[in-house]
């Protein structure tokens, strides 16, 4: 005890200057410091206290209680005081160097943590306030002291005080005399012990100390407390008596709740004296067994409310005094403190007892640190029996080392709470925690992960804890890949709250979270999305493209909820970054690389899942774009987004708007029928009865009556039309939901849907309607989902009519034009300037114009009020004029032009038909026809005929002008031929005077001779307007291409087809054949000339008179055109030929035999094959759908054979067998087998298709070639086809069976034997066994696998790039697999689209490489930029959309 006192005196002397708090017990550390002060106190072995303290210091001792409370309850103030470091573990720390808020345990929820924090803060504030008030109260008490209004005690009686306080006195007198004694002792100065010997004996008498009357015991305690004050620093009693005295003191301290209000002043003064002189510092010395029970009793009486605040403060002071005096902290005391520390109310909120204990330990944290280290060793030590098995004692609550078993179970909670108090508390346990993190038991790993996640999430200590043991932090981060989902969830919660000043550590955590984007559990993937969003919004510069890649990929997740969260999260992130850094153009390169692709990613999802489409629209409309009332800003942001969209995503966005348009049209048609079923349901147009004969009028009336008698059938048609455009909803059929919508009970919702479908409804009104409808569809029924889908699909959200005003303003601003003056229309011809027209736009075509063009193709009616503004742009550069003409051509039906503006527009369009650009001239002519037809024609009121004399005169003048330019040898040949071709196609009569001139020009001067006419070299348009070919042509080739197109239009538009017309067609074929011998043109020019001729002939063959006259050789030439390959990969001209062929066939303008041309494209690149498969599938499905709706008698008719897709197989086999390389392909026939396999794959889907093709092959084996009767090539090809058919479909186990088609081989191509007219199935099987013409040891070459039912091509051999693409996809999917500790953790969360809440058969997934090709159509090599401008013009004119080619009328 002496050594301990010496150390204490020395340390107090060191810290006295800093704290200004004198201590009663001073410890000695070294001998030199003993001589520094005469006030050093030592405790002798016999327990006496020595002191030289002056009486002047008594006031300081009395203030110590108040100062102590202020230090404990106001740690923020004590932090400002400089303190010296204390190295002696037993030395108590009067003040705390760091102040930390009370934190709940690891088991509390975030809301509970918040409540706990607030409760702790409120308690601290209350205690701080109370501390100051208690200080002032104590000062007053010190000055006045307690007076009992009694006569002073007679001092002489002290000598015989034992007799004076004899047991014969009544309780009232005893109390009265004790009060007098207390008052006397209060006035007695410290150290004046004269006459108190007998008093001491009396006070320790059991009749007073153990009296049943509380007031007697209280007054005895008051007197004893004053005795201790007077005798300080010596002890007035020996150890035996002290036990009795301390028993009385502890009993009185714990009776605070029972003290009467009248006695509270005496009670509080007693506690104050005990606190000031720190009597309870002797408790451990007097009786250590009383220590833990006293702590337990005090802690159990803590209330934590305002009413009991003084007592809570007193308990805190007493317990602090005891802790400061301890040489070592017993295990039982740690048990009690820690049990109180982790005590929680229901819901996990810390109790007032836990908060009190937290503050108690925090105040003495530095002193308790070493003692806790020793306790921690026992706490973490596992209990082992002699046999090596874990001890399990059910009969005892304590373990071998005295630690509570409950504490051992909650060691992780203890570690976290102690870490909150002082991080150094848990440093000795870090190694054990690292072992626990790698334990086999998942619950142990989870417990360690929880406590460390809480610790590392502490902002003030995370960096220090990481640096303390880096290996522990690395092991902890590895738990992101734990097998147990609960542990991975804990780690995700940690990453959400993790904060650090180190960017490196933050990046490590983000990478770990990124790996969880491919977690097997959707909830963890959702959590990873939320965490990324939080970090990005907080600091976007933390991101890099590598981290963002998986984040963006979540919009393609297989789980619908994950996709939904990803779409909303990405939209929120993009908006946050834009609000912080401004428009995308102002972003840094890093931000652009990371976040500019977000709109692209969202738009790309429009092509994946049906249930995501309207969510993407909501994300755009409500998050990416500003508020609906700010239309100007919405327009600017939309332009900004559209600028950074890839070309493929722009097309996807356009396609989605077209889907919305289709649904809106069908929905409004249904509504119109409901309003007026007689007009709409009858589907008849009113006609004049005077112009119809009586019989026809009667028939029409009967038809209308029949239709009106069946309104239900009519409405079913409209419902079906709407249903065809809806996805599938879970629980109900979409058709039933449409019927439910049109019931009277849903009339309000229906009216709102009609209103939101109106193009004039503003964005704000649309938003209000959406809110109104969605508020009525809060449940999760199918009808609610259907209503939500409809309200978003029918609305003109994202972009609509309101945007046009600001888009046109922005376009005028970009072009530097003056503001539009509606009251002062301009004369376009006067404003037109050729220099301005020929001048290219400096920065290319503005994105504003591109958006306007896209909108005109989808919503042509939104331009109705802006016609005068649009035509004003026709005086700008040719790069601007071309898209403006497209807009006018798309929206001409809805534009409202004044008469003066219309006349000026027609004059301007005629002027543009003579510009040097053929594409622009042709578009100007077609636009002129659209505007001029209603303006220059009228209906005669007398006979009802159309009077188009004005239009004919105008067109004749145009034709005369064009031929005059030819005579004058104008350098505008290409445009003149283009416009003449348009005139010849639709209005051949206006060229009647110039037919001979045209024949001479086309046949004699251009096609078969040398043309002396020339054209201007500067004819190209801006590259962003036209997708021209990246080729180089000679001038003669360019002229011939223009002539071929003009000739095809001329032949198509002729009223009467004569022998001369057929000769012109044959001349084109001869020119086609002669190209192979031509030495003037290079290989590319020859190939492209052939393709142009094929396109022209396909256009001509729409007239059946031409098509019927072609020979088998000519048919072969047409089909072989699709097999032409050039050095250009994916030649756009080949694609255009395929698209032209598909167009005329789907419109049934060419017979099915031309399907053979699709099969001859088998050797083309993969992108071309995909296009072929797409168009051929569309044609075949259309034909089969028509056949399925025909009556059985009609479908079996012989004249319908040519309508079946399978009827093209004989023609295709003929083309394959007459290839020049067919015989050279022997004996393996690899190329021939490739062609046959590809075409068979296109046609065969089911068993009946298989049987039809099988029958055709067997019949062909018995036929003879009509051209070369000795040739057996077609039989060899048929045998190849049979082997392919058997090999590729052997898993289907199909066999030849009866089919609904009569096989008729074309007589021009094959000679048919009479015995084949009625061949049975047995005959077909027999014909297979005929002697084969294939080599004896022939083996079928390796062939690509067939496509599946979803039309997904599994071709592995068609193109080498396909294998590369699949390998890259596999590498990308498996990129992060090796980072995980478990096998089931990473299971391809990005899957092929499947059905979700709203589901339909998924769209075909495009490979990454193919998507990349679609996204970069503008990339061109610099080596070929020097091509002639005229070449670009001709090729671009060929690529323009030919929707107007359907106008074949005269």
Curated annotation (Swiss-Prot):
One of its GO terms (cellular component) is chromatin. It is found in: Nucleus. InterPro entries: ARM-like, ARM-type_fold, Pds5. Residues 1402-1427 have a biased composition (Basic residues). It comes from Dictyostelium discoideum. May regulate sister chromatid cohesion during mitosis and couple it to DNA replication. SUPFAM superfamilies: ARM repeat. Residues 1-145, 680-707, 1340-1450 are annotated as: Disordered. Residues 77-138, 692-707, 1350-1363, 1387-1401 have a biased composition (Low complexity). Keywords: Cell cycle, Cell division, Coiled coil, Mitosis, Nucleus. Residues 1369-1378 have a biased composition (Basic and acidic residues). Pfam families: PDS5. Residues 682-691 have a biased composition (Polar residues). The keyword rRNA-binding does not apply. The keyword Coiled coil applies. Belongs to the PDS5 family. GO terms for biological process: cell division; DNA repair; mitotic sister chromatid cohesion; negative regulation of DNA replication. Residues 45-59, 1430-1450 have a biased composition (Acidic residues). Residues 650-716 form a coiled coil. This is Sister chromatid cohesion protein PDS5 homolog.
């Amino acid at each position: 005890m002496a050594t301990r006192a010496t150390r204490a005196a020395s340390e107090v002397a060191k810290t006295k200057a800093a704290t200004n708090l004198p201590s009663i017990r001073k410890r000695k550390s070294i001998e030199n410091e003993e001589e520094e002060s005469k006030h050093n106190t030592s405790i002798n072995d016999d327990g006496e206290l020595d002191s030289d303290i002056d009486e002047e210091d008594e006031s300081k001792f009395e203030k110590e209680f108040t100062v102590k409370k202020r230090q404990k309850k106001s740690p923020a103030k004590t932090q400002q005081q400089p303190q010296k470091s204390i190295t002696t573990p037993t030395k108590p720390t009067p003040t705390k160097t760091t102040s930390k808020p009370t934190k709940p345990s690891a088991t509390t929820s975030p809301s509970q943590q918040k409540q706990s924090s607030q409760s702790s803060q409120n308690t601290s504030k209350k205690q701080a306030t109370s501390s100051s008030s208690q200080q002032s109260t104590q000062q007053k008490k010190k000055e006045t002291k307690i007076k009992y209004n009694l006569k002073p005690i007679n001092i002489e009686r002290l000598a015989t005080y034992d007799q004076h306080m004899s047991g014969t006195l009544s309780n009232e007198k005893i109390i009265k005399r004790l009060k007098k004694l207390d008052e006397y002792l209060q006035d007695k100065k410290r150290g004046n012990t004269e006459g108190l010997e007998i008093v001491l004996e009396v006070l320790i008498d059991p009749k007073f100390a153990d009296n049943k009357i509380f007031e007697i015991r209280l007054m005895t305690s008051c007197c004893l407390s004053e005795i201790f004050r007077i005798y300080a620093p010596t002890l007035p009693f020996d150890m035996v008596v002290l036990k009795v005295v301390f028993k009385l003191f502890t009993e009185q301290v714990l009776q605070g709740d029972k003290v009467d209000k009248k006695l509270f002043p005496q009670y509080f003064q007693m506690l104050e004296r005990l606190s000031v002189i720190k009597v309870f510092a002797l408790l451990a010395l007097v009786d250590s067994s009383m220590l833990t029970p006293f702590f337990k009793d005090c802690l159990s009486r803590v209330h934590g409310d305002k009413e009991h605040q003084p007592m809570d403060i007193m308990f805190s002071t007493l317990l602090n005094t005891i802790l400061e005096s301890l040489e070592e902290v017993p295990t039982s005391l740690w048990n009690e403190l820690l049990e109180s520390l982790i005590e929680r109310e229901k819901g996990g909120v810390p109790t007032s007892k836990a908060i009190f204990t937290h503050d108690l330990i925090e105040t003495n944290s530095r002193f308790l640190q070493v003692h806790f280290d020793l306790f921690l060793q026992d706490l973490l030590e596992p209990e082992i029996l002699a046999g090596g098995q874990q001890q399990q004692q059910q009969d005892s609550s304590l373990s071998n080392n005295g630690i509570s078993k409950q504490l051992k179970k909650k060691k992780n909670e203890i570690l976290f709470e102690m870490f909150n108090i002082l991080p150094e508390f848990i440093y000795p346990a870090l190694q054990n925690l690292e072992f626990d993190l790698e334990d086999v038991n998942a619950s142990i790993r989870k417990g360690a992960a929880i406590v460390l996640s809480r610790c590392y999430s502490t902002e003030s200590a995370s960096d220090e804890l990481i640096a303390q043991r880096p290996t522990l932090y690395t092991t902890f981060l590895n738990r992101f890949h734990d097998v147990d989902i609960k542990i991975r969830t804990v780690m995700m919660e940690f990453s959400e709250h993790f904060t650090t000043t180190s960017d490196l550590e933050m990046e490590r955590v983000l990478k770990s979270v990124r790996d969880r984007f491919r977690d097997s559990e959707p909830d963890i993937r959702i959590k990873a999305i939320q965490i990324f969003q939080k970090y990005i919004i907080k600091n976007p510069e933390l991101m890099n493209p590598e981290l963002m890649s998986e984040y963006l990929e979540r919009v393609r997740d297989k789980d619908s909820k994950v996709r939904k969260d990803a779409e909303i999260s990405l939209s929120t992130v993009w908006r946050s970054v834009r609000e912080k850094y401004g428009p995308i153009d102002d972003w840094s390169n890093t931000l652009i690389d990371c976040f500019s692709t977000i709109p692209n990613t969202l738009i790309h999802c429009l092509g994946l899942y049906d249930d995501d489409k309207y969510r993407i629209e909501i994300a755009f409309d409500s998050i990416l774009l500003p508020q609906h009332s700010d239309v100007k800003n919405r327009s600017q942001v939309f332009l900004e987004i559209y600028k950074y969209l890839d070309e493929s995503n722009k097309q996807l966005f356009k396609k989605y708007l077209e889907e919305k348009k289709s649904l809106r049209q069908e929905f409004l048609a249904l509504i119109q029928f409901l309003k007026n079923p007689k007009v709409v349901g009858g589907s008849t147009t009113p006609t004049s009865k005077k112009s119809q004969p009586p019989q026809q009028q009667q028939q029409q009336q009967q038809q209308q009556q029949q239709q009106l008698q069946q309104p239900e059938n009519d409405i079913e048609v409209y419902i079906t039309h709407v249903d065809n455009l809806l996805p599938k909803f879970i629980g109900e059929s979409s058709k039933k939901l449409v019927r439910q919508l049109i019931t009277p009970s849903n009339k309000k919702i229906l009216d709102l849907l009609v209103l939101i479908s109106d193009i004039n409804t503003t964005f704000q009104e649309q938003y209000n309607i959406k809110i109104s409808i969605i508020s009525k569809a809060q449940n999760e029924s199918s009808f609610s989902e259907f209503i939500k889908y409809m309200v978003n699909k029918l609305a003109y959200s994202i972009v609509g009519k309101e945007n046009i005003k600001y888009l046109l303003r922005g376009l005028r601003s970009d072009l530097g034009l003056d503001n539009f003056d509606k009251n002062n229309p301009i004369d376009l011809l006067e404003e037109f300037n050729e220099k301005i027209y020929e001048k290219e736009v400096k920065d290319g075509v503005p994105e504003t114009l591109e958006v306007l063009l896209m909108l005109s193709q989808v919503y042509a009616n939104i331009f109705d009020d802006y016609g005068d503004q649009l035509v004003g742009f026709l005086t700008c550069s040719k790069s601007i004029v071309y898209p403006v003409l497209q807009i006018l051509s798309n929206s001409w039906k809805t534009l409202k032009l004044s008469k003066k503006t219309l006349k000026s527009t027609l004059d301007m369009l005629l002027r543009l038909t003579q510009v040097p650009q053929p594409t622009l001239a042709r578009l100007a002519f077609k636009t002129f026809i659209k505007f001029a037809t209603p303006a220059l024609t009228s209906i005669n009121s007398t006979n009802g005929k159309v009077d188009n004399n004005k239009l004919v005169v105008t067109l004749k003048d145009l034709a005369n002008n064009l031929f005059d330019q030819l005579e004058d040898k104008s350098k505008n040949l290409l445009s003149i031929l283009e416009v003449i071709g348009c005139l010849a196609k639709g209005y051949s009569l206006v060229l009647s005077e110039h037919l001979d001139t045209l024949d001479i020009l086309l046949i004699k001067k251009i096609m078969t001779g040398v043309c002396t006419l020339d054209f201007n070299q500067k004819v190209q348009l801006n590259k962003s307007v036209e997708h021209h070919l990246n080729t180089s042509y000679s001038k003669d080739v360019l002229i011939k291409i223009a002539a071929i197109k003009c000739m095809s239009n001329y032949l198509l538009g002729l009223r009467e087809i004569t022998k001369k017309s057929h000769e012109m067609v044959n001349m084109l074929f001869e020119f086609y054949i002669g190209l192979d011998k031509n030495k003037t043109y290079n290989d590319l020019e020859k190939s492209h000339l052939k393709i142009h001729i094929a396109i022209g002939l396909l256009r001509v063959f729409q007239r059946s008179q031409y098509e019927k006259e072609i020979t088998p050789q000519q048919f072969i030439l047409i089909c072989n055109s699709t097999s032409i390959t050039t050095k250009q990969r994916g030649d756009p001209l080949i694609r255009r030929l395929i698209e032209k062929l598909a167009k005329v066939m789907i419109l049934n303008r060419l017979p099915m035999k031309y399907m053979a041309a699709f099969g001859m494209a088998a050797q083309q690149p993969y992108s071309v094959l995909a296009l072929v498969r797409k168009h051929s599938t569309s044609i075949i499905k259309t034909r089969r759908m028509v056949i399925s709706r025909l009556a059985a008698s009609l479908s079996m008719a012989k004249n319908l054979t040519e309508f079946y897709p399978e009827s093209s197989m004989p023609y295709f086999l003929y083309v394959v067998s007459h290839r020049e390389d067919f015989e050279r392909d022997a004996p393996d026939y690899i190329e021939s087998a490739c062609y046959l396999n590809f075409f068979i794959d296109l046609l065969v889907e089911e068993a009946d298709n298989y049987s039809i093709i099988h029958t055709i092959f067997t019949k062909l084996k018995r036929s003879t070639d009509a051209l070369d009767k000795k040739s057996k090539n077609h039989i060899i090809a048929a045998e190849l086809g049979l082997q392919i058919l058997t090999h590729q479909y052997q898993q289907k186990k199909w066999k030849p069976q009866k089919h609904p088609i009569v096989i008729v081989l074309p007589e021009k191509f094959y000679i048919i034997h009479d015995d084949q007219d009625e061949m049975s199935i047995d005959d077909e099987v027999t014909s297979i066994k005929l002697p084969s013409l294939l080599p004896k040891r022939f083996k079928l070459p390796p062939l690509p696998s067939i496509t599946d039912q979803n039309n997904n091509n599994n071709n592995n051999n068609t193109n080498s790039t396909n294998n590369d693409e699949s390998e890259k996809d596999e590498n990308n999917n498996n990129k992060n697999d090796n980072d995980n500790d478990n096998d089931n953790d990473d299971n391809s969360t990005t899957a092929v689209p499947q059905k979700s809440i709203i589901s339909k058969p998924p769209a075909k997934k495009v490979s990454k490489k193919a998507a990349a090709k679609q996204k970069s159509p503008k990339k061109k090599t610099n080596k070929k930029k020097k091509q002639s401008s005229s070449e670009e013009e001709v090729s671009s004119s060929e690529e323009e959309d030919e929707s107007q080619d359907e106008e074949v009328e005269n």
